[in-house]
Every structure is written in C-alpha cells, then in structure tokens.
UniProtKB/Swiss-Prot annotation:
The gene is prr-1. GO terms for cellular component: endosome. PANTHER family: PCD6 INTERACTING PROTEIN-RELATED, PROGRAMMED CELL DEATH 6-INTERACTING PROTEIN. Keywords: Coiled coil. The keyword Translocase does not apply. This is pH-response regulator protein palA/prr-1. It comes from Neurospora crassa (strain ATCC 24698 / 74-OR23-1A / CBS 708.71 / DSM 1257 / FGSC 987). PROSITE patterns: BRO1.
Amino acid sequence: MTTTHVLSLPFRKSTQLSLSRAIQQYISAKYDQHPDMFRHDLDTIDALRRDAINVREAHPSGIRKLQMYAAQLVWIGGKFPIDVGADFTWYPALGYHTEHPLVQNNLKYELMNVLYNLAALYSQLAVASNRNSTEGLKTAASWFSHSAGVLTHIKTQVLPELRMPSPPDDMDETTLESLIQLFLAEAQECYWQKAVMDGYKDASIAKLAARVSDLYNEAGEAAMRSEAISSAWIHHMSAKHHHFAAAAQFRAASDCLERKKYGEEIARLRDAVACVNEGLKETRGGYLSKAVVEDLQGLKRRLEEDLKRAEIDNDRVYLHIVPPKTELKRLDRANMAVARVPPQVAKPYEFLGDPSAEFGPALFTKLVPFAVHVAVSIYEERRDRLVNNSIISELESMTSQLHEILSSLNLPGSLQALEKPLGLPGTLVQHADEIRQADALYRLQQGLTDIDKLCSSDLAIFEEGRSLLLAEEEEDSRLRLKYGTERWNRPQSRQDPSPNGGTKLWRQAQDIEGYFGSSTASDQVVREKFNAVRDTLTILAGSDRSIMDFIPNSRRTDIPESLKPALGRLRSAYNDVQRLESRRRKRVESLRARSRADDIKPDILVEAARLERAYPTTAIATAHFEDFFEKRLDRLYESELEAVERDKQEQEKIVQEVKRANKEFEAQKRQVDRAGGGNREREEALQKLDAAYYKYKEIVSNVEVGRKFYNDLSQIVEQWRGLVRGWVSERRRDARSLEEEINMPPLSSLNMHQSSFSYQQQQHHQQPPPPPPQIPFPEPIQPHQPIVEQAHIQSWADNVPQQQPKPVAPGAWAPNMGIKFGSPVAQGQQHQQEQGQPGPVNATWDPSQGIRFG
C-alpha cells in the first residue's frame, strides 16, 4: 500500500527498433533520392528514439528528450506515409494486460506513445515535488497541468488521426478523459493546499475544495467507462471526491461560524460528516493508500468535534433553526487548474529549424515530401488527360470528320484523276512510302493480336475471381439449406455489407463484365474496319508498279479549258484543307513534346516549401496543391483549348468553301464526261487508296487506345481478384467457425453433477461386477459423518423427510475420499493375499504409475 496522496501515470515501455532502417528502405523504394544523402538524419532519428524510450525516471532532463523526438516525428509525418514500414512495439501502462505488447506499423501510434510518456513524466515530477512548501505546490500544480495538457493534445490532435480500428485500452478516448480530469483535480488540489498554507479565508478555500471534488468526480465517472483504469484508482478518485466535498462544506461551515450563521453551520457540518462517511466506505477492500485513509479519518474526527460543539452551542445559546440540506446554497467554485499544452508539443515546428533552434534542424528537409510525389503524379495524370482527351483527341476527331466529308465528295480522287491522268500522284506516293516504312499490315495485325492476348489474360483473371465468388455463394447456400436460416445467420454472399464484402465485389463484377462487353464490341468494330481496307492496304504496301496496275490511266491526258476555272477553285479550297491538317499535325506534335517537357517537380517543390512555411503545423497533403494545379494548367494549356475552338470554326468555313467549289466542279465535269472525256475508273481507284490510308491512321489510333484500355483493365481485375480471394478465405474461415459452433453439444449434456448422481444411483441398484485383476480398485473409504447440529434455516421444504446419503459402492470414487498416490490394496489383491500371494511391498508414489483416486 502506497503512502502518497496523489496518483501519477506510469510509463509505457517499448523495445529497441531501427527506425532508420525502415525509412532507408522506404526512400530506396519510393523516392528518386539515394538514402546515403540522409545518413546523418537516419543516425539522428535512431539516437532520438533510443533516448526517448529510455526515459524511465522522474527527472526533468527526460522532458527535452521526449519533446525532441516527438517534434521530429511530427515533422517526418509530412515526409513519409503513416505506415512507413517500422513495427513499433509498446507495452500498456494501465489495465490488466501490461505484459502483452501491441505492435503497429504506424507513425502516429509511435507519436501517441511518446507523448503519453511525456504526460507520465510530468505527472511523476509533480508527485516527486516537495508539496510541503508553497513554491513546491506551485511547481507540482504546473507539472500536473502540463500532464493534463499533453493528454488533451493526444485526445484532440493525435487520436483522430491514428487510423487504427481501435486504440489501446489505456489510450482510448474514455481513458484519456479520465486521466485529464484526474491530473486537473490533483493540480487543483495543489492550489487548495497552497491556499490553506497561505491562510486564505475559509470561503475562498471552500470554493477551491468544491472544484477539486468536482474534478475527481468527473475523473471517476470516466474511469468507470474505461477498460484500463483499475479498481484501486477508481476507489481513490471516489474517496477524494467525497473527501473534498466534505472539506468544502467544512470550510463553508467555518465561514458560517464567522458570520454567525449557526444553523447553517450545523447543516453544513452534518453534510460534511455524511460526505466523509461516504469516502470511508471506499476503504473497504484495502484499495486506498494509507495517506488517503488517514486524511479521511482525521477529517472525520475534526468534523465530529466541531459538529458536537456547534450543536451544544446552538441548543444552549443561539437557538438557530438548522435548515435542511435542500435549502443550503450551492457552494461557488473557484477553478485554478487548466490543461496547459507545452508549446513544444502544440507547435513543434517553431522549435525546429537551423542548428541554433531549441530542437536543432528538422530531419530529412532535403527529402521531397511523400505528398509532393503523389501530387506530381496527380498533376501529370490531369495534364495528360487534358492534353490527350480535351485537345489532341478533339483535333483528331475533327480531322476524321473532315476526311469523311472529303471522301463523300470523292476528294482528292477527282482532283488527282484530272491533274495526274497518268502515273501516280505525289501525295499517293508519299502515303505508300509511309505504309511501307511502317510495315502497316504487320503492325495492325500484331496490334490486334496483342489486344486479343491482353483481353484473354484479363478475362481469365476475371473468370477466376468470378468462379471464386460463385463457389463461395454455392457453399453458403448449401450450408444455409443444411442448418437453416435461424442458425446459419450470417449475411448471404451478395448481401455482405462489409467494406470489401460480397455486395461490393459482386457489383464490381458486374461493372467489369460491362467493361468487357463494351470493349469486345469496340474490338469487333476495329477488326471490321481493318478487314474492309486490308486488300487496299496490301496494294498500298506493294511496289509502285503494283499500285500503277491497280489505277487505270485516264483516256485523255489534257484538261478541258472549260473545266480549268472550277478545277482551280476546288484545288485552292482543297489546299486550304491540307494546310489546316498540316498545322494540326505540327500543333499535336508540339503539344506532345511540350507535355513531355512539362516538369512540375521544381515548381512544386517551391510551392511545398512555401506551404511548409505558411502552415508549419499542418502536414502537406495533395489537396493543398489544387489551386496550384489549376493555375498552372490554365497558364500552359488554356490557349490550346481556345485554339481548338478556333480550329473548329475555321474547319466549318473551309468545308463550306470546299463543298461550294466541288459542286461547281462536278457540274462542269459532268458536261465534259458527256462529251466523252470521262476518267471515272481512275478517280474511284485513287479515292479508294486515299481513303484506305486515312482509315489506316484511324485504326492505328484505335489499336493504341485498345492496348492501353486492356493494360489499365488488367490492374483493375487483378486488384479485384485479390480482394475476392481475401474475402472468400475470410468467409470460409467464418463458415468453419460457425459450423463448429452449431455442431457443439448443448450445455445440458455437460451436466457433470447429474451424470455423477445417475452413476451413483446405478451403482446403488446394481451389484458391480468383479474387477479385472490387472486393474486394482481401491478399498472403499468410510465417508465422514455428516454434521447433524446446524443452524436452523426456514425452508418451504421443512416437511420433506431428509434424504440420507447413499452408500458408496465399492470401487466408485466419492469427493470425500480425497486423492491418494501409490498402489492401494484392491479387492482383487486382497483376495490374492488371502491365498498367500505377495501384495505390494512399497506404498511410495512412483511417477510411472500415474495418479489413481482412492
């Protein structure tokens, strides 16, 4: 039993761990910076942790060690994810499982434990202070206030970001609240004691004591809801609550005596006696310390003496009416204890910086924060989506529409047939060279083959996951049918609402199935496009001679004079089309090059440094860069988006001009054709080759899109299959557990007393058979005689005749026989001895003989 009046928080203990090794491995795996750049920082973080976890005594030097390590943990929390890869081991300080550690890969968990030990150190320093002087009391109150402040910081700032299913029992919200109120109560108690020593007025001391009582009461109520705070602490808080309630009334009674309110004095003294008696009830069981018990007993003696004196004086002299307790005015409260969070804990960034700072330089300052790396990836994804989908894809779509319009107008075939009546047009030669150099047919066939392989691979992964879901659903249905819905009471497979349960997985399966359905239809469209132009592409991929053989020469080699003006206007309009296409190609190439060169890392590091300076207490998150992203994308690519709109308007004008010129050209050409100068066959052949070239470009784009789609889909289905495997395994384990629970025998079949009684009844009514000679049964031992003279107990069964104990059959063990070791003489052996055969010669227990009852 301790002799202290107040409680302190014990330290949580940890084991040695190389945090630097986990950080080093993480830097190597996730960052593009070499870990050797941070060798000094890695050594420093290990040294800080080693010093912090070895703080085991109540000495002020430990405060700096814990605060320094905690500050660096807060700082590196903005550089690394919470699960950096270090398994932190900590033993509880309170509760009934202090020998069982909790291991977590969690930086916030480590920070929480370090701050918890800082609060424990403050409380132990307070208990160790000299509370026999006013200065010592002020110091102790300050330590207790800092302890409550650190615990408040843990509760409000660290615990909400812990990201654990449930915090340790001695660090959950209820336990922390109880500890906060406890140390505030002990700080307030120091102020009360100082007021007593300084000779404050009774009324002021009463207000301080009343607040002490309130705080102990709040601490005790929270402790009752905690799983970690012991019964001894709860009894201590309750006793102190009643003690200071009595002390407050005692001081209020003294104030009443001074103000000559003798009736109220007696009422308050009576209430004080009642309170101290309630406090003394907590002494049962030996939970309270000797000092607390002595304080209660001393206060009770003083109260009883004063009450006796006050009642005699009032009865003989003053004759004041004693008011009931309900009419007494509630005592005012004077609160002095406040939870004070040390600035080193509340604002650790202010104590990190250059080497002259209190905690020295911040570690890993040259390491790019993890959130910045994620932000870079997010920006690059948004940039690529903007460039590819909103600009390049839009331009390519407009170009495809333009070629469809030109093809419907039979352009440029009709122009080329007239301008180049013999041989191959220059544009066609360029297209053919491009087809040959790209090995177009093989490229398209290989691309379609790759798409088939990727699709088959993704589909196989998906089918595996779906088969697992179907098998699990079938198993669950079979067991549900076997045991019934009342006993098989877990959710059905498709109705499991857990975060990654059946409901979500089946819904995702439907989504993925939809992806496959739409992609298969798109793949078929692309194949049909390829099959439609395969033969024409084969001609384009051939030699110039084979192309010339495919294209018939015109029957006339000169252009009629009547057709030249219309031909010139159409050629001019078509040249505008080609210039528009050329500008688009150059713009797309330039845009892609600029997108590849758009390195945001230097600028985002500057922005991250600005954010760290502006918000030192806030860990950098990707959301902090949203405005930065928007401004940068607008500055770099807004002009390109506007150019797309201008291109769209320009294309509409050019198309209108081409249609007008082509209409005039076709009218003039029909007159020439009627005169016998037609070249329709050559025109159609040239148009067919030109259309095949542009269709080839379109198919190449489609194939690239398909390949990217299936590569992205593979990541989705693999992740989904992994979730399915985990969920199915969990469901099967759950099913086995539930089935074992259902198949367990009912508790009624385990009634040992009933079985033993039935066995004795059976032995009483049946003559036991002679035991085998190799299994000796013990001699029956006479049971003790029952005690006849007992205290009379009134019972509704008094008239029932008392049952006599039944005799124990030979060879049957009874509870009153006890346990004997050795080889007792059994009936069979006795019979052998009567015939002159030797019996056992040694009654010493032999371990090889086991344990026998008798």
